[in-house]
Amino acid sequence: MACSEFSFHMPSLEELAEVLQKGLTDNFADVQVSVVDCPDLTKEPFTFPVRGICGQTRIAEVGGVPYLLPLVNKKKVYDLNEIAKVIKLPGAFILGAGAGPFQTLGFNSEFMPIVQTASEHNQPVNGSYFAHKNPADGACLLEKYSQKYHDFGCALLANLFASEGQPGKVIEVQAKRRTGELNFVSCMRQTLEEHYGDKPVGMGGTFIVQKGKVKAHIMPAEFSSCPLNSDEAVNKWLHFYEMKAPLVCLPVFVSKDPGLDLRLEHTHFFSHHGEGGHYHYDTTPDTVEYLGYFSPAQFLYRIDQPKETHAFGRD
């Protein structure tokens, strides 16, 4: 599998906290950004298979939207244990956003990878979720992957944040009451882009929508048989929902593309009340509350980059 490697700009956590504090204040009424010890992510509401998001951090972008649109390329299937080896971190803890492994499921879905990959001494642990539209009533159907399936697949496209899964220092972000137009992730990403310019910074981690509701989408179970050639066509194909807090989100974002055809931000989420999907923005600016834990990435790995590309379907 072809792979390009890039070293991110890595400011100190303290500097990043200061930059994010300033930028988020333009978009939220109440903002507190600080450097803290990562909370134990094995506990509720996260229930991850590891305690933290620290140690040898990297971002992997695998495949891309051109393998889904305008028409699906069903040859593009991946394995998260193999991806961990490609990014030189066997045993990595991987979280993020991608397309579900249709090669196993038999249909298309939104995928929330949460995987402790295989290493020399440890068996892999799959804490992933997938979301699809319930054919019976049109509602979201969120399922824990390992309750039915035992592989570590994903497909088509994935934006992944990987680490050793260790405890350590992270950036805690609390933001309440949105006053600007940007969603939580876009605000952080654009703040970093404005501050660091041509020095790309990559970040990942997890955040909770503690209060409020969000606009979300779930892809149809059937891939489109007619070509989807614009954002408008894609939006007609997708199923949109409003979903309620608390939601556990898995963001991956990069301040600026270093010329590797990146999807600059991508966030999927799950919950313990049966809702999950692709995060767009909150729909309750007056009441929304976000609490997140983030770590900067040292390296970027661009895996199986599409040779033919386009700019739609990346929202």
From Swiss-Prot:
Domain of life per record: Eukaryota
Annotated S-S bridges: none
GO BP: DNA damage response; regulation of DNA repair
Localization: Nucleus; Cytoplasm
Cofactor(s) it depends on: Zn(2+)
Keywords: Cytoplasm, Hydrolase, Metal-binding, Nucleus, Zinc
SMART domains: DUF1907
GO CC annotation: cytoplasm; nuclear body
Family matches, as InterPro entries: C11orf54_DUF1907
Binding site for Zn(2+): H266, H268, H278
Location (main, coarse): nucleus
Any one Gene Ontology molecular-function term assigned to this protein's record: zinc ion binding
EC number from the UniProt entry: 3.1.-.-
Enzyme type, top EC level: hydrolase
Pfam name, any one: DUF1907
Biological function: Exhibits ester hydrolase activity on the substrate p-nitrophenyl acetate, in vitro. Regulates DNA damage and repair by regulating HIF1A degradation via chaperone-mediated autophagy (CMA).
Subunit architecture: Monomer.
PANTHER family registered for this protein in UniProt: ESTER HYDROLASE C11ORF54, PTD012 PROTEIN
Name of the protein this chain belongs to: Ester hydrolase C11orf54 homolog
